[in-house]
Amino acid sequence: MSYVVWDIETDSAQTDWATIIELGAILLDDNFKEKDRFSVRCRMPQDRVPSATALCINKSNVDLITKGNLSHYEMLVQVEKKFREWSPATFLGYSSINFDDEVLRKEFFKSLKKPYLTNTEGNSRHDALNIVKAAFAID
């Protein structure tokens, strides 16, 4: 089984309103050796206004998020293609189940793509935040 460690940057800190503007992922083998790397950024859709909180968290600015080469939809097509290419895998992130997965699902759904890509068709998901919480609870 392979592992995909991934993270997103968005224009909002709320899952209901967030739009992905950047995604980074690393494919690891069973021994946690890097096999592939993927990073993609898009320009923010013109109908969106980024939250100041998100810009601070992302260490970004309006120029950076409005001048990408890819449209938001083109970026999602590339993400879907890469995640399917890397499947089956366990998708890992930090706070990914409560934020990243939710935002990705909503973005895929709005773009008429399969929203549950990270936990169907042999894929599974896990959240490093839950591992940290469990370790803290045991200690």
For the regions a language model picked out, list residue spans one by one:
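Conserved non-catalytic scaffold segment of RNase H-like nuclease domains
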Residues: S2-E107
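A short coil-to-beta-strand element that immediately follows conserved catalytic motifs
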Residues: E34-R37, T120-S124
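Amphipathic alpha-helical interaction segments
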Residues: W86, T90, S111-P115, D139
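Substrate-recognition/cap helix-loop segment adjacent to the acidic, metal-dependent catalytic center
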Residues: F99-N123
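Short alpha-helix plus adjacent loop in nuclease-associated cores
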Residues: G122-D139
